[in-house]
């Protein structure tokens, strides 16, 4: 199988990879969709936060802020929230 059917990488890891790539590319609509799926695949809020921090390092703070905004909307819709721990 190709893509999601490939058993070489588990679904959680693949979700994390997708979030990093989509965030780096600035594809926020797709990022939001995959953020929801990532939760179903076992990715935690802390792991999503860590992915966003890496996006900030390699792609810039403005792009990381876009990802935080998208994540906050996804989590708000699910009645959860995510915060940048560095700001607390």
Question: Language-model segments: which ranges?
Answer:
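Acidic, glycine/proline-rich low-complexity segments that act as flexible tails and inter-domain linkers
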Residues: 1-12, 40, 64-88
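N-terminal alpha-helical segment
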Residues: 13-15, 31, 48
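Short, structured motif recognition centered on aromatic/hydrophobic residues
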Residues: 14-22, 52
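Short alpha-helix boundary/capping elements
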Residues: 21-27, 59-60
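Extended intrinsically disordered, low-complexity coil regions enriched in Ser, Thr, Gly, Ala
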Residues: 29-46, 66-72
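Short acidic/histidine-centered micro-motifs embedded in hydrophobic/aromatic stretches
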Residues: 51-55, 70-71
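Substrate/cofactor-recognition hotspot
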Residues: 54, 61-65
């Amino acid at each position: 199988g190709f893509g999601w059917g490939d058993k070489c990488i588990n679904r959680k890891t693949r979700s994390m990879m997708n979030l990093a790539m989509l965030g780096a590319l600035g594809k926020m609509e797709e990022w939001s969709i995959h953020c929801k799926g990532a939760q179903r695949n076992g990715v935690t809020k802390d792991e999503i936060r860590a992915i966003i921090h890496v996006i900030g390092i390699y792609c810039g703070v403005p792009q990381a802020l876009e990802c935080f905004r998208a994540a906050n909307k996804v989590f708000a819709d699910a009645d959860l929230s995510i915060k940048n721990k560095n700001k607390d």
